[in-house]
UniProtKB/Swiss-Prot annotation:
Residues 56-123 form the BTB domain. Residues 17-28 have a biased composition (Basic and acidic residues). GO terms for biological process: proteasome-mediated ubiquitin-dependent protein catabolic process; protein ubiquitination. Keywords: Actin-binding, Cell projection, Cytoplasm, Cytoskeleton, Kelch repeat, Repeat, Ubl conjugation pathway. Substrate-specific adapter of a BCR (BTB-CUL3-RBX1) E3 ubiquitin ligase complex that mediates the ubiquitination of target proteins, such as NPTXR, WNK1, WNK3 and WNK4, leading most often to their proteasomal degradation. The BCR(KLHL2) complex catalyzes ubiquitination and degradation of NPTXR. Responsible for degradative ubiquitination of the WNK kinases WNK1, WNK3 and WNK4. Plays a role in the reorganization of the actin cytoskeleton. Promotes growth of cell projections in oligodendrocyte precursors. The keyword Repressor does not apply. Pathway: Protein modification; protein ubiquitination. Component of the BCR(KLHL2) E3 ubiquitin ligase complex, at least composed of CUL3 and KLHL2 and RBX1. Binds actin. Interacts with KLHL12. Interacts (via N-terminus) with FYN (via SH3 domain). This is Kelch-like protein 2. It comes from Homo sapiens.
Length: 593
């Protein structure tokens, strides 16, 4: 029996029409076949024709570079060329078209992109590639350049990228660079780019409510540094700049000891008026301060950047290279690039977007080497060595300089102190402390550097004494002693208060904690930690004080706990480090974007 013919696939059963039917309803039921490789294959062939100079109908000239191409391809991909070749301009008929605004190599890259959809953006070419892509209206290339620049944002270049984005109408990149500068203000102001800004740009930056700063003193010191960079020209702008510094939010001691003594303030009657306003604010009862409304009494409201706690090296039980980070948001630890060499008992700071591991012990020698870690590149680099070998030292940042305080050189405890200038990559000595201090803890409050406790090898005693350094006078001064001797205490700063955590006095390892208030020059006890710790790392983040690792007198600890000053309680973090470590360097950084 013969099989009956099947009805056409595109028609309804019982209502067949001839193939040349004009009924549009038939087409609605026909599947459309799309070949995803067709366009790619076509452009590949067109590019091969171009490379052989076949069917080319125009030569694009830039400088001494001549590039053969097809008008229809250029017009299809670039609105710039579309307008050129379809309009009434003479170029629409010309065999050779010269483009003066773009260099030859850049133009070749962009025409290659038109045919291949491939382009490589690098640090070397992005500044010429982006404006050229803008000229040719190749928006995808321009977007790729902007994304590349966004990935390169760093405290040393974000202001330059912001200016570049503004010049070339890259609105999204401009906003992201501006936000980055606000979020990394404390490091940005240490850069050459900041010092070279114009007055309008400085005012715009420091007036932002979104600045992420630990204290308003960062803004004041930035203003002084900017003016002093070209003092003869810029000192006339002091009053205008100080209008945006929120002096009432600074501690009274800082106003008296630093702001009032600054020559640039003394020489300006308007600046003195702002200082008087700030002092009046401090004299008012708390309930009346809210009535004194001005832009300078308004708290800044920064966007909180995600934070990471970085734990570098340490003793586990020997000196190690391992570096791990704790993500506060994800509540987990992860490993990052190891130190170039083993290091424990080092000083640790975060400055200018970099983590610095200063001095320490490599398992056999006390060292004076310094390594810096770039979180964006996940890479360690060596910088200038200190002048002296130091382990169990304290390290802190004051007025843009990294200070290495005291320590042990292998034979004796040290009272000497040296400072590192990141711009010149040089170390220099400053005034020594009054007492030799190894296993010393340090912190900065109100523009002063504090050295807390430690061990004096001369007297062979753990210390309860504390002294502070004034960089303006280059002098160390004793302040109130702690209630107990502490060597190897963790020291941290939270809410303009100085905390001394744990430590030991001889064989006795402590869990007690005391806090110093510079306004009263007095120490007071707060809640004990959950466990005894000495040689632990301390850092403050999000209103909490974290204590990391250390040892309890018998073993190294992998645990972490934090102190909440509101509740006066310590809480153990559920996630521990991968290994117990004491004498590790600890600091908090902004999570790389």
């Amino acid at each position: 029996m013969e099989t009956p013919p099947l009805p056409p696939a595109c028609t309804k059963q019982g209502h067949q029409k001839p193939l040349d039917s004009k009924d549009d309803n038939t087409e609605k039921h026909c599947p459309v076949t799309v070949n995803p490789w067709h366009m790619k294959k076509a452009f590949k062939v067109m590019n091969e024709l171009r490379s052989q100079n076949l069917l080319c109908d125009v030569t694009i000239v830039a400088e001494d570079m001549e590039i053969s191409a097809h008008r229809v391809v250029l017009a299809a991909c670039s609105p710039y060329f579309h307008a050129m070749f379809t309009g009434e301009m003479s170029e629409s008929r010309a065999k050779r078209v010269r483009i003066k605004e773009v260099d030859g190599w850049t133009l070749r890259m962009l025409i290659d992109y038109v045919y291949t959809a491939e382009i490589q953006v690098t640090e070397e070419n992005v500044q010429v590639l982006l404006p050229a892509a803008g000229l040719l209206q190749l928006q995808d290339v321009k977007k790729t350049c902007c994304e590349f620049l966004e990935s390169q944002l760093h405290p040393v270049n974000c202001l330059g990228i912001r200016a570049f984005a503004d010049m070339h109408a890259c609105t999204d990149l401009l906003n992201k660079a501006n936000t980055y500068a606000e979020q990394h203000f404390a490091d940005v102001v240490l850069s050459e780019e900041f010092l070279n800004l114009g007055i309008e740009q400085v005012c715009s930056l420091i007036s932002s409510d979104k600045l992420t700063i630990s204290s308003e003193e960062k803004v004041f010191e930035a203003v002084i540094a900017w003016v002093n960079h070209d003092k003869d020209v810029r000192q006339e702008f002091m009053a205008r700049l100080m209008e945006h510094v929120r002096l009432p939010l600074l501690p009274r001691e800082y106003l008296v000891q630093r702001v009032e003594e600054e020559a640039l303030v003394k020489n300006s009657s308007a600046c003195k008026d702002y200082l008087i306003e700030a002092m009046k604010y401090h004299l008012l009862p708390t309930e009346q301060r809210i009535l004194m409304k001005s832009v300078r009494t308004r708290l800044r409201t920064p966007m909180n950047l995600p934070k990471l706690m970085v734990v570098v090296g340490g003793q586990a039980p020997k000196a190690i290279r391992s570096v791990e980070c704790y993500d506060f948001k994800e509540e987990r630890w992860h490993q990052v690039a190891e130190l170039p060499s083993r290091r424990c008992r080092a000083g640790m700071v975060y400055m200018a977007g970099l983590v610095f591991a200063v001095g320490g012990f490599n398992g056999s020698l006390r060292v004076r080497t310094v390594d810096s870690y770039d979180p964006v590149k996940d890479q360690w680099t060596s910088v200038a060595n200190m002048r002296d070998r130091r382990s169990t030292l304290g390290a802190a940042v004051l007025n843009g300089l990294l200070y290495a305080v005291g320590g042990f050189d292998g034979s004796t405890g040290l009272s000497s102190v040296e400072a590192y200038n990141i711009k010149s990559n040089e170390w220099f000595h400053v005034a020594p402390m009054n007492t030799r201090r190894s296993s010393v803890g340090v912190g900065v409050v109100g523009g002063l550097l504090y050295a807390v406790g430690g061990y004096d090898g001369a007297s062979r005693q753990c210390l309860s004494t504390v002294e502070c350094y004034n960089a303006t006078t280059n002098e160390w001064t004793y302040i109130a002693e702690m209630s107990t001797r502490r060597s190897g205490a963790g020291v941290g700063v939270l809410n303009n208060l100085l905390y001394a955590v744990g430590g030991h006095d001889g064989p006795l390892v402590r869990k007690s904690v005391e806090v110093y208030d510079p306004t009263t020059n007095a120490w007071r006890q707060v809640a004990d930690m959950n466990m005894c710790r000495r040689n632990a790392g301390v850092c403050a983040v999000n209103g909490l004080l974290y204590v990391v690792g250390g040892d309890d007198g018998s073993c190294n600890l992998a645990s972490v706990e934090y102190y909440n000053p509101t509740t006066d309680k310590w809480t153990v973090v559920s996630s521990c480090m991968s290994t117990g470590r004491s004498y590790a360097g600890v600091t908090v950084i902004d999570k790389p974007l």
